[in-house]
């Protein structure tokens, strides 16, 4: 779904602070 897709983008292109990754539960490697 779109949510998972956004997570993939956030993981591939870290354009947000690290705390945003933790918020998404998608910290490149999880």
Curated annotation (Swiss-Prot):
The keyword Ligase does not apply. Keywords: Blood coagulation cascade inhibiting toxin, Calcium, Disulfide bond, Hemostasis impairing toxin, Hydrolase, Lipid degradation, Lipid metabolism, Metal-binding, Secreted, Toxin. GO terms for molecular function: calcium ion binding; phospholipase A2 activity; toxin activity. InterPro entries: PLipase_A2, PLipase_A2_dom_sf. Belongs to the phospholipase A2 family. Group I subfamily. Snake venom phospholipase A2 (PLA2) that shows weak anticoagulant activity. Is more catalytically active than the strong anticoagulant protein CM-IV found in this venom. Acts by inhibiting the complex composed of tissue factor (F3) and coagulation factor VIIa (F7) (TF-VIIa complex) by only enzymatic mechanism. PLA2 catalyzes the calcium-dependent hydrolysis of the 2-acyl groups in 3-sn-phosphoglycerides. This is Basic phospholipase A2 CM-I. It comes from Naja nigricollis (Black-necked spitting cobra).
């Amino acid at each position: 779904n779109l949510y998972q897709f956004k997570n993939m983008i956030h993981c591939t292109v870290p354009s947000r602070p690290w705390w945003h990754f933790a918020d998404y539960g998608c910290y490149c490697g999880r």
